[in-house]
Amino acid sequence: MPKPINVRVTTMDAELEFAIQPNTTGKQLFDQVVKTIGLREVWYFGLQYVDNKGFPTWLKLDKKVSAQEVRKENPVQFKFRAKFYPEDVAEELIQDITQKLFFLQVKDGILSDEIYCPPETAVLLGSYAVQAKFGDYNKEMHKSGYLSSERLIPQRVMDQHKLSRDQWEDRIQVWHAEHRGMLKDSAMLEYLKIAQDLEMYGINYFEIKNKKGTDLWLGVDALGLNIYEKDDKLTPKIGFPWSEIRNISFNDKKFVIKPIDKKAPDFVFYAPRLRINKRILQLCMGNHELYMRRRKPDTIEVQQMKAQAREEKHQKQLERQQLETEKKRRETVEREKEQMLREKEELMLRLQDYEQKTKRAEKELSEQIEKALQLEEERRRAQEEAERLEADRMAALRAKEELERQAQDQIKSQEQLAAELAEYTAKIALLEEARRRKEDEVEEWQHRAKEAQDDLVKTKEELHLVMTAPPPPPPPVYEPVNYHVQEGLQDEGAEPMGYSAELSSEGILDDRNEEKRITEAEKNERVQRQLLTLSNELSQARDENKRTHNDIIHNENMRQGRDKYKTLRQIRQGNTKQRIDEFEAM
């Protein structure tokens, strides 16, 4: 029995190991990988390996794995990577797993500087990457340093600014907090929506020469072929959409593209190696097929995938809403519980205050009772004294009357009678005055006793109100709350040094609608505002002496108001012949 071949496939976030038979084809291995990870949008992806000469190569699906130029190692190493890119991630990517794989691959390309990204965009993308990994920022959970082990922004950007690692993390943390409420899957999609507007996103670059021998770059992407000057990979100079191309072929190092416009000459360039032309042809055929497929009605399978994805997304939204509702309910219960505890404490304090007031009222009542008794005693003594004085007065009156009678009965001298009469009259006047004062005093004591009695009654009423008030309510009791492109070049060709492929453009709808696109920053005011704020912040710490060649080109494009899609419209102006003539003249 043939000995199995051990294979290790590395995706962007996992390592898979398989044992395959010597007669296993590339498609069988590919199908095993996508089945394992649950991927249905297989047309974007391929298996990449480093061949015997050290060049990165895509595994041919129609050939046996063992018959291809894979290195003889154990296990045989492959990378599962995106080979083709969508035009618009938001419109085309269906499954969450597809979004995640693109997100991780694009992020890796930006962090390694394979895709140029300006500083302010790099920081904003870094914050979306943090949201995609950690979810909502929580200051209790995400303590200082929680980003210390994360790759956040390209090293180039860090080197260009006078900011420490902590200062970079602080900036990203602030923007992380801005994304509160955004799902992790949504954060990945937002990342890709911004990243797809970067000039180098989704482009495969190849060194070529025109007939004059000028060194140039050929860029192959989802929208067509673009020509770049050797020192500028950001700004294409000439563009050809896939809908303008009817045939592509190569013979040895010569590559020929035949336009649909029969008045236009062939578009010819030269690659340094035959294997580069093979790769260019594969990418052209695959990207052209996807370009045409996107401009035709969806197949039943794609419609079903989209419907399933919508249902899954809807279900996730419902689950999210339920979680948010439950979270808010718990927060409400916690707030109510805290409020009840505060009210309980307030009631206890009020009860203590009532008790203290009661004790004071009882003490005051006791003092007032004692004072009332004292006043009553004083009144009684004053009454007795008034009665005694009244008795003395009456006695004096009687004596006076007796004297008067005696004066009538006896003959006394006028002087003696007058003297006695004057004496008793004076005494009577004194007694009258004393009696009047005592009556006033008695009246005063009676008034004070009445006031004391009124105070006593009032105090008793207050005490009765305190003692009969309903007790504070007891604290509440809480219950515990809880989806291929059919491979372009299946064979390297019936002829060993050449290959030709016809590219059909029939039946497509709105073949150049990509020229109407605008960047995410232009259509999204929030992203535009965030990028402007970040640009202003970073400009204060930027070391202008460390700007790279790409930085200078990007800044000049920005200064002239150019972006990826405005440049695309510009480089496709004129007819095909004019653009081919421009290419030949470069």
UniProtKB/Swiss-Prot annotation:
The modification Phosphothreonine is found at T567. Phosphorylated by tyrosine-protein kinases. Phosphorylation by ROCK2 suppresses the head-to-tail association of the N-terminal and C-terminal halves resulting in an opened conformation which is capable of actin and membrane-binding. One of its GO terms (biological process) is establishment of centrosome localization. The modification N6-acetyllysine is found at K60. Residues 2-295 form the FERM domain. Detected in eye lens fiber cells. Expressed in cerebrum and cerebellum (at protein level). Component of the microvilli of intestinal epithelial cells. Residues 308-338, 540-565 have a biased composition (Basic and acidic residues). Residues 302-462 form a coiled coil. GO terms for molecular function: actin filament binding; ATPase binding; cell adhesion molecule binding; disordered domain specific binding; identical protein binding; microtubule binding; protein kinase A catalytic subunit binding; protein kinase A regulatory subunit binding. Residues 306-338, 534-565 are annotated as: Disordered. Interacts with PALS1 and NHERF2. Found in a complex with EZR, PODXL and NHERF2. Interacts with MCC, PLEKHG6, PODXL, SCYL3/PACE1, NHERF1 and TMEM8B. Interacts (when phosphorylated) with FES/FPS. Interacts with dimeric S100P, the interaction may be activating through unmasking of F-actin binding sites. Identified in complexes that contain VIM, EZR, AHNAK, BFSP1, BFSP2, ANK2, PLEC, PRX and spectrin. Detected in a complex composed of at least EZR, AHNAK, PPL and PRX. Interacts with PDPN (via cytoplasmic domain); activates RHOA and promotes epithelial-mesenchymal transition. This is Ezrin. It comes from Mus musculus (Mouse).
